[in-house]
Amino acid sequence: MYRAASDTKSLAISAATKEVFSYVEALKHGFFLVRKTKLLTNTSIKDIQQVLEHNNAGFRRVPGTTLKNQLGEIVYTPPQNADEIEFYMANLEKFINDDTISELDPLIKMAIIHHQFESIHPFFDGNGRTGRIVNILYLVIKELLDIPILYLSRYVIRNKGEYYRLLQDVRVNNSWEEWIIFMLKGVEETAEQTIYLVKQVSIMMAEYKFKMRPVFGKVYRHELLNNLFNHPYTKIEFIMNDLGIKRLTAAKYLDMLVDLELLKKIKVGRENYYLNTKLIDLFMNFSVEVQDNELNRIITTHE
């Protein structure tokens, strides 16, 4: 990820890394757009998709888009006409932002919004990731989230087969209940995982603070601690900007943190990066643990 941040055109960067980096940037951009207005407009949705896909194509204008299964068979044909797509997206925009239309709980409404968005399939590319960002931003504008930290994509990707089956089942059989329960379960699971992760990060920050204060003494600042946890890595420029200090001072602070074994220094090209390896390990181990728990659940279910 730090390589992607320094040079998104580098051949050494995997496509998956670029995709994650684009997702993070699109989510941050979307949050910036909605946090003050509390509105999620089609203009904002187009902007989010533009950041994701690095193009300005907007909604589909040319027919021919179909959704296929793994065998290559067409299972669903979304609206083809450009005017139709604009019409449906205008209706969806109103449903998202006008609470007088429906008194449904926001979580149930989120599940409906997501299904409608995926069924309209307004873009040539990036519909899935854009739709999942829309989920999170909707919870933000409804003040169920202060910041967009509920990573529903993990749940959707892990249960991809069931996700697509239920999407189609609503289209064919109007089976809304099973779909909504699936999405609510995703919110519940993801919320529990996020709470656990936040608690672990909080514990780790307290441990870092305990080690830093005696060494830094009077020059210790909480902004420095926060900087180490804003990203899995930091560098001299980040410290300079966050603390308002000179380059030599920032470099000195980072070297002190390396000596304390709180950061690991590596060189990428001409730049030095300082990795918070304990934070990286926490996220990596958490990811493996979630996968193991899901595997155990599947095994138990089929015993």
Regions of interest found by a model, annotated:
Residues 1-303:
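FIC/Doc superfamily catalytic core
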